[in-house]
């Protein structure tokens, strides 16, 4: 799963306190759908996903992106039990939605990119390392039902 040092936890929590969940969530999910278009098949009910501008302006993409990052915020409070924290979401995405678990890894990487854009110089290599460790652990926790 990945062991988080106290420094990792402090770094993740500190930056998370400055994240605008609505903006970053919409941008993260939107970028995932644009950069990895095959992920769009899980979002048929979202309406127009025909172009980058349609995706980035789609209110359903923004709303679901906010929901995803809100869930991530809950996980940040439970870094030592990500598998337990995401047990129900893992089951939902595996058994009911049949989401390819690789998509969780891709979404995490896109989130790291979005945070780097939003926080610029504040998003140091050390901050990136802690966040990368976290999104990798979250992807693993969300994929746990698949194994």
From Swiss-Prot:
The modification Phosphoserine is found at residues 45, 51, 53, 140. This is Hemoglobin subunit gamma-1. Keywords: Acetylation, Heme, Iron, Metal-binding, Oxygen transport, Phosphoprotein, S-nitrosylation, Transport. InterPro entries: Globin (IPR000971), Globin-like_sf (IPR009050), Globin/Proto (IPR012292), Hemoglobin_b (IPR002337), Hemoglobin_oxygen_transport (IPR050056). It comes from the Eukaryota. Disulfide bonds: none annotated. One of its GO terms (cellular component) is blood microparticle. Pfam families: Globin. It comes from Pan paniscus (Pygmy chimpanzee). PROSITE patterns: GLOBIN. The modification N6-acetyllysine is found at residues 60, 83. Red blood cells. The modification S-nitrosocysteine is found at residue 94. The modification Phosphothreonine is found at residue 13. Heterotetramer of two alpha chains and two gamma chains in fetal hemoglobin (Hb F). The ratio of gamma-G to gamma-A chains in is approximately 2:1 in infant chimpanzee, and 1:2 in the adult. The modification N-acetylglycine is found at residue 2. GO terms for biological process: hydrogen peroxide catabolic process. Residues 3-147 form the Globin domain. GO terms for molecular function: haptoglobin binding; heme binding; hemoglobin alpha binding; metal ion binding; organic acid binding; oxygen binding; oxygen carrier activity; peroxidase activity. Gamma chains make up the fetal hemoglobin F, in combination with alpha chains. CDD domains: Hb-beta-like (cd08925).
């Amino acid at each position: 799963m990945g062991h988080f040092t106290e420094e990792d936890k402090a770094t993740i929590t500190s930056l998370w306190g400055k994240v605008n969940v609505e903006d970053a969530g919409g941008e993260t999910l939107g970028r995932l759908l644009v950069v990895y278009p095959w992920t769009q098949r899980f979002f048929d009910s979202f309406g127009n996903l025909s172009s980058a501008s349609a995706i980035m302006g789609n209110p359903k993409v923004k709303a679901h992106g906010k929901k995803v990052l809100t869930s991530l915020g809950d996980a940040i409070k439970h870094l030592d039990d990500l598998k337990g924290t995401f047990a129900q979401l893992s089951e939902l995405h595996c058994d009911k939605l049949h989401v390819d678990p690789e998509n969780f890894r891709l979404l995490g990487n896109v989130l790291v990119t979005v945070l780097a854009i939003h926080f610029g110089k504040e998003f140091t290599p050390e901050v990136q390392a802690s966040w990368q460790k976290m999104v990798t652990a979250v992807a693993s926790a969300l994929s746990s039902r698949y194994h």
